[in-house]
Amino acid sequence: MSAPWSHLLALAQEEVHRTCQRLPADLRPHADAVPVSYESAPGEALLAEGWEPDLLGMFVGDPVGVEDAESSPFPRQILLFLENLWDFAEGVEQTYREEVRITYIHEFGHYLGLDEAELEERGLL
């Protein structure tokens, strides 16, 4: 049920761009500040740390406002696992786009320090 990587990547980048454009104006600078990395699935290092192989996305690094010596050693970024998202969407392009959007917003929420309820209150989910 796989699709060519270039196709998955193009769809995901387009959907993330579209999602960022639709964010409230006060959140757009934050979206510009956190890079998005696109990978097929979690790598061996993440799996060794106990993450599930079917993980859809994750935020690494510290949320906005956390800047101390004991903070995360990783730079802030959102990871989207495109083949997992495609499989989760059962190979349906429109569903894939929607799952990319939902996963991006969910991980962006972690970057902002927001939980699911707060994202819903803001109308983002």
Feature-to-residue mapping (PLM):
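Short hydrophobic/aromatic patches at helix-to-coil boundaries
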Residues: 121-125
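Short alpha-helical catalytic segment bearing the HExxH-like zincin motif
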Residues: 99-107
